[in-house]
A protein has these predicted regions:
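Membrane-water interface of transmembrane alpha-helices in multipass transporters/channels
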Residues: 1-4
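Divalent-cation
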Residues: 9, 14-189
Length: 189
């Protein structure tokens, strides 16, 4: 009986840490080598054209202070996040991204998930970071970008609606991206 109480107390006290550990374990493709399945990525790779379209859209939106949140899938699947939004499955173009994030459109709230050269989904919910060191002046969009980068290997582009500044979240860190060329280098690297 005392063992059951101790286990329950342990689970309650360490719930956030256990959840994070399980998320990270679950996000690693442990079976991918064994179950090698074709996910269609080979014909839809993230390429230079996609990079150019993303850079163009990002800095066009920054110029007019249109808030945006674009999550680029890498090794870790973002299917769970994608399920929280609306399927798009459209080729990445600057026009599509700008239209999605246009303020008075139905799709502007939330994030888009980009897989290869496609916008997989829009209006997606992202996990918010618990990191208390994130600047308080930054809003929910930035906290969400850091949050998804803490639990996946994704790269997230953020455009601030307040300032028009562009940032990138990767590996739990948020960094400012001052120029289109700097963003192009990050996306190509």
């Amino acid at each position: 009986n005392i063992t059951a109480i101790a286990v329950t107390a342990f689970l309650v006290v360490f719930q956030p840490e256990l959840r994070k550990a399980l998320e990270q374990l679950g996000s690693q493709n442990l079976l991918s080598g064994i179950l090698a399945q074709d996910d269609g990525k080979s014909s839809q790779e993230f390429n230079d054209r996609t990079v150019n379209e993303l850079v163009r859209a990002t800095f066009e939106m920054a110029k007019v202070k249109t808030g945006a949140l674009m999550v680029i899938e890498r090794g870790t699947s973002l299917k769970e996040i994608e399920r929280t939004g609306i399927e798009i499955s459209g080729l990445v173009t600057s026009q599509l991204l700008i239209n999605i994030f246009e303020h008075n459109t139905p799709l502007h709230d939330g994030a888009v998930v980009i897989r290869g050269n496609r916008v997989a989904a829009a209006t997606c919910y992202l996990p918010l970071s618990d990191n208390m060191s994130i600047n308080k002046a930054l809003g929910t969009r930035h906290r969400a970008a850091v949050g998804v980068s803490e639990t996946t290997d994704s790269l997230t582009i953020v455009v601030s609606e307040e300032t028009g500044r562009v940032s990138v979240a990767e590996g739990g860190m948020l960094r400012s991206v001052p120029t289109a060329e700097a963003l192009r280098n990050i996306l190509s690297g």
